[in-house]
Regions:
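N-terminal membrane topogenic signal
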Residues: 6-20
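Membrane-interface helix-boundary motifs at transmembrane edges
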Residues: 8-11, 75-84, 131-139
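Alpha-helical transmembrane segments of multi-pass membrane proteins
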Residues: 23-39
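Membrane-interface helix termini and inter-helical loops of multi-pass transporters
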Residues: 35-49, 161-162
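Membrane-interface loop-to-helix entry segments
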Residues: 51-65, 108-119
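Membrane-interface helix caps and helix-loop-helix hairpins in membrane proteins
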Residues: 100-111, 159-163
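Membrane-helix boundary connector in multi-pass membrane proteins
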Residues: 104-107, 125-139
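Terminal transmembrane helical module of multi-pass membrane proteins
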Residues: 134-163
Length: 163
């Protein structure tokens, strides 16, 4: 009996580590691909309220951990069509999230990046609703992500206007 419990805990631990690794991995690869463009970004005219550069990786790491935790709460919930749709939306928004910094930093397509960010915000909103329908806590964990994307949209749009 205890042995079964140990295997169960190991499976849940493996699931948790996996769902945390996915968004952190997306962020790490995206960050690696855009690191050469940070000098260009720092030379741009910045809108008011732009935080210092060190804030971005700290906030994104926290957001990736929260969204990974939210996806864990969904992944361990009973298998339903709602759960499947929510996890598909989660995967799609992660893919869209991955491409935004490439459009913004590497390509310098500020207006395109803003439109992409609006799409990302909408997908995250739908994902948050889908998560909240299954687990209220999972939905709550996604709210800071929506708030940050709203702020990122402000920064993105005004960088487009100012540059």
């Amino acid at each position: 009996m205890m042995r079964t419990g140990g295997i169960f805990l190991k499976k849940k631990t493996k699931t948790l580590l996996t769902v945390l690794a996915v968004p952190l991995g997306v962020g790490a690869v995206s960050g690696f691909l855009t690191q050469g463009s940070m000098d260009t970004f720092e030379k741009l005219k910045q809108p008011p309220l732009t935080p210092p550069g060190w804030v971005f990786p700290v906030v994104w790491t926290g957001l990736f951990v929260m969204m990974g935790t939210a996806s864990y709460l969904i992944a361990v919930s009973p298998k339903t069509e709602k759960r499947k749709r929510a996890l598909i939306l989660y995967g799609v928004q992660l893919a869209v999230n991955f491409l935004w910094p490439i459009f913004f930093f590497n390509a310098g397509w500020y207006l395109c990046a803003f439109a992409w960010l609006v799409l990302l915000w909408y997908l995250v909103y739908l994902c948050t609703k889908g998560f909240a329908d299954i687990s209220r806590n999972a939905g709550y964990l996604m709210i800071p992500y929506l708030v940050w994307l709203t702020f990122a949209g402000y920064l993105n749009f005004f960088i487009f206007l100012l540059n």
